[in-house]
């Protein structure tokens, strides 16, 4: 898939009450109620698991090994968002590390899910109240050439993710929930 240059600054976010319906629900239980095929590829793992990740997807698509649009995304995302980066599964260059994650945390962003590589694994694992899921780690830094896209549908670990999807992660993995089915899914998972 070719990557253009597009920035969608805002999108419809689900009501906070809908997102919090999934608080403390295990990803495995939610996945069971989504046909047992909703979780992303198991290669995308938590970096230093710290409890549940819960928020709203703020999507970014970047060229392999390039993080120019991630810089823009950090400033556009809102508190409660989870930045979801489609890096095409490329693992030879990190998209971000501890410094960028620290900036995101200071802005109220809940975490980052990256279908690509990160760096500073130890620093990311030690961060409190900030969650990172990634395909791998490498010390190699990124390019900053662009282009890239913000708040467009992306693919993470083989699953479609749209801006505004509900993000739920735990030590088993991460999945994304379409807000249109979220209330019914929460009811089924609570039962």
Where are these regions (language model features)?
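Feature captures the catalytic cores and cofactor-binding loops of soluble hydro-lyases/lyases
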Residues: 2-163, 176-191
